[in-house]
Amino acid sequence: MSAKAEKKPASKAPAEKKPAAKKTAPSSDGKKRTKARKETYSSYIYKVLKQTHPDTGISQKSMSILNSFVNDIFERIASEASKLAAYNKKSTISAREIQTAVRLILPGELAKHAVSEGTRAVTKYSSSTQA
């Protein structure tokens, strides 16, 4: 038997990689290290807020809650899409797996709107890369 045939799929997903926290105190050579960047969806949430309610602001606490919500939903969709790909013996998550995962996770009308917006975004991206 070859080594490739003996490989078994991992029983659980690999651990999420987190950037190492950098020090702000000066090091031995006198240079100050910068803090590790934390990636959030704050700027995107703010842009959507301004499109829908231009005269409304948002507190830091509310922004933090929405950021956690977006991360949670993305994690659920990715996890479900991963399971769907595994069930179908595929190693790649495609738009079809994402769409099915969204239909399974989001309830009723929300799923319909999410699927239509996702399809529209993929179509827009596809047409922009071909041109």
UniProtKB/Swiss-Prot annotation:
Residues 1-19 have a biased composition (Basic and acidic residues). One of its GO terms (molecular function) is protein heterodimerization activity. It holds the Pfam family Histone. This is Histone H2B.2. CDD domains: HFD_H2B. Signal peptide: none annotated. It comes from the Eukaryota. The modification Phosphoserine is found at residue 11.
